Amino acid sequence: MDVAAMARCVGRCYVSPAFGESESHRLSERRFLKLSSSTNSDPAGSKSLKLRGKIHRRMSYFRPIMAKDESISSRSGETKQINGKQKNIVWHDCPVTKSDRQELIKQKGCVIWITGLSGSGKSSLACALSRALHNRGKLSYILDGDNVRHGLNSDLSFEADDRAENIRRVGEVAKLFADSGIICIASLISPYRIERAACRALLPQGDFIEVFMDVPLHVCEARDPKGLYKRARAGKIKGFTGVDDPYEAPLDCEIVIQNSRDKGLSSSSSSSSSPSSSSSSLCEMADIVVSYLDQNGYLKKHSTKSRNCM
């Protein structure tokens, strides 16, 4: 039987447990497969999948949830257009709502989007903020710009189109976290206003909280914790934000954290009346954001745990 015939016969299959192993032990290793219907005999042009150390040609991963030939109920009963093309995909409602999930964990889901130049302290603030929320009994998760490229976005380059897709994917995943009731902390350079605005538009009004790390370029370059500015100045990295690619600072974000050699750290919020801070401590930085969340009703119930954010 040729590959095309096999593809017609086999709709879906999964990697079964190895001989002698229990179903539950290998459950996490299941992968749905799809056989390619291509008849191209060129091995170099075919896709392959490695299973238990062996290469299987003309097989590729695919998403198991597909609406083709399925009748799925939706709120509108209409199919959805994706990228301008009609798809047999409709929304399926669930009786457990976002409000139900938020009531269960006693907090409101939202996205805290930390933006700024490389070396401005985005990841450090994200970790300190996550610890501060954890100490208050609040559930959060960090989507770090570097970390997501190890998995979710490992197929993307740093070309313009792929950088835009990187932001789009993180925005969509952050939206899902917020919908689950989790406080999602996304820390990415995200240099362009239009891309940050697109992510904001994914969420209900007020659930996208933009935090701008307003740190001067010369300060970030002096820190250069990853050596990226040095490589960019030497011409080894092209299109590096702040060197040969622009960073568009937010014009109307919720929180601004500024850092200068003379004044240390200060903060301002466009939507709250919290006083500014003059400490450069990570805990103080995290408290600026926590105070905003508290004042705007995202933290429904306080914890008596320590305020230590590290």
Curated annotation (Swiss-Prot):
Keywords: Amino-acid biosynthesis, ATP-binding, Chloroplast, Cysteine biosynthesis, Disulfide bond, Kinase, Nucleotide-binding, Plastid, Transferase, Transit peptide. Pfam families: APS_kinase (PF01583). One of its GO terms (cellular component) is cytosol. Disruption phenotype: No visible phenotype under normal growth conditions. Transmembrane segments: none annotated. Pathway: Sulfur metabolism; hydrogen sulfide biosynthesis; sulfite from sulfate: step 2/3. It is an enzyme of class 2 (transferase). Its EC number is 2.7.1.25. It catalyses: adenosine 5'-phosphosulfate + ATP = 3'-phosphoadenylyl sulfate + ADP + H(+). Expressed in root vasculature, root tips, leaf epidermal and guard cells, pollen grains and radicle of immature seeds. Residues 1-75 form a transit peptide. GO terms for biological process: cysteine biosynthetic process; hydrogen sulfide biosynthetic process; sulfate assimilation. The record marks F158 as: Participates in a stacking interaction with the adenine ring of adenylyl-sulfate. Substrate binds at D146, R149, R163, N166, I189, S190, G239. It is found in: Plastid, Chloroplast. InterPro entries: APS_kinase (IPR002891), P-loop_NTPase (IPR027417). ATP binds at G116, L117, S118, G119, S120, G121, K122, S123, S124. GO terms for molecular function: adenylylsulfate kinase activity; ATP binding. The active site is at S190 (phosphoserine intermediate). PANTHER family: ADENYLYL-SULFATE KINASE 4, CHLOROPLASTIC, BIFUNCTIONAL 3'-PHOSPHOADENOSINE 5'-PHOSPHOSULFATE SYNTHASE. Belongs to the APS kinase family. Catalyzes the phosphorylation of adenosine 5'-phosphosulfate to 3'-phosphoadenylyl sulfate, which is the activated sulfate form for sulfation reactions. Essential for plant reproduction and viability. Homodimer; disulfide-linked. This is Adenylyl-sulfate kinase 4, chloroplastic. It comes from Arabidopsis thaliana (Mouse-ear cress). The gene is APK4.
